[in-house]
C-alpha cells in the first residue's frame, strides 16, 4: 500500500465514513433524519478514495476503525487513505486488517499518551509486517468468509425479527392485562 495524497477539488463526491463495526460506508446511509451529513462548510480538500483503497481513521485504528472501501468518494482529511500497489483481493484485506491480530499490531504500533489518544501514523503503518497469502488463496478465503458472513447475517436478521415480534407480543400482553382484556386472578389467569 502507498498513501494517497489525492484530494477533492470540488467536494461533491460521496462522503464516506469509517466505523469500527462495518468498515467504510457511505456517510448518507448512517445519518439520522434530524442529523446533518457533515458540519463542514466545504468538502473541498477531503481525501479522495477509490474502490479498493484502504481507509484508516488514524485515531481509531487500534479500535478497528478502518476498512477497504467498496465506494468511490471522499474521506475526512484526518483519515489515511492507502492505495494497493499490487493486485490484491479487497475483501480478503478487509477481513485481514480488521482481525484481532492486525488490530493488536495497530495498537502496539500506535503512539499517544493514553489509549483514547492513540494514533497510527503512516510511518508506523509501513513498518508493520502482516502475513499475506498468494492472490488465489486470498480470493478463496474471502469467498468463504463472504458466504459464511452472509449466512450469519441472515440468521441475525431472523433472530432480530423474532425479538421485535416478541417485544410487540409483550407490549400487547401488558396492554391487555392493564386494560382488563385479560383478567388476572390470584394464582393464575382467568380468561
Regions found by a protein language model. Give the residues of each.
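Generic structural signal for secondary-structure transition and capping sites
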Residues: 6-7, 102, 111, 171, ...
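Sequence-specific dsDNA recognition surfaces
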Residues: 1-51
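A short beta-sheet element
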Residues: 46, 51-103, 108-110, 114-115, ...
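Short, hydrophobic secondary-structure boundary micro-motifs
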Residues: 10, 105-106, 185-186
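Short, solvent-exposed loop/turn positions at domain surfaces
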Residues: 37-43, 114, 157-160
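Non-catalytic DNA-recognition/assembly elements of restriction-modification systems
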Residues: 1-11, 127, 131, 135, ...
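Amphipathic alpha-helical coiled-coil/heptad-repeat segments
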Residues: 132-191
Amino acid at each position: 500500500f502507498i498513501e494517497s495524497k489525492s484530494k477533492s477539488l470540488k467536494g461533491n463526491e460521496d462522503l464516506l465514513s469509517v466505523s469500527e463495526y462495518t468498515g467504510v460506508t457511505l456517510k448518507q446511509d448512517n445519518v439520522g433524519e434530524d442529523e446533518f451529513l457533515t458540519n463542514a462548510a466545504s468538502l473541498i480538500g477531503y481525501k479522495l478514495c477509490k474502490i479498493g483503497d484502504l481507509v484508516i481513521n488514524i485515531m481509531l485504528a487500534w479500535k478497528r476503525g478502518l476498512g477497504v472501501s467498496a465506494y468511490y468518494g471522499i474521506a475526512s482529511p484526518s483519515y489515511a487513505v492507502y492505495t494497493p500497489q499490487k493486485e490484491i483481493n479487497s475483501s480478503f484485506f478487509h477481513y485481514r486488517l480488521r482481525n484481532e491480530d492486525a488490530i493488536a499490531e495497530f495498537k502496539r504500533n500506535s503512539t499517544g499518551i493514553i489509549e483514547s489518544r492513540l494514533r497510527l501514523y503512516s510511518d508506523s503503518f509501513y513498518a508493520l509486517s502482516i502475513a499475506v497469502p498468494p492472490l488465489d488463496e486470498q480470493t478463496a478465503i474471502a469467498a468463504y468468509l463472504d458466504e459464511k458472513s452472509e449466512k450469519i447475517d441472515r440468521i441475525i436478521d431472523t433472530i432480530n425479527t423474532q425479538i421485535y415480534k416478541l417485544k410487540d407480543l409483550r407490549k400487547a400482553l401488558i396492554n391487555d392485562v392493564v386494560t382488563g382484556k385479560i383478567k388476572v386472578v390470584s394464582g393464575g389467569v382467568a380468561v
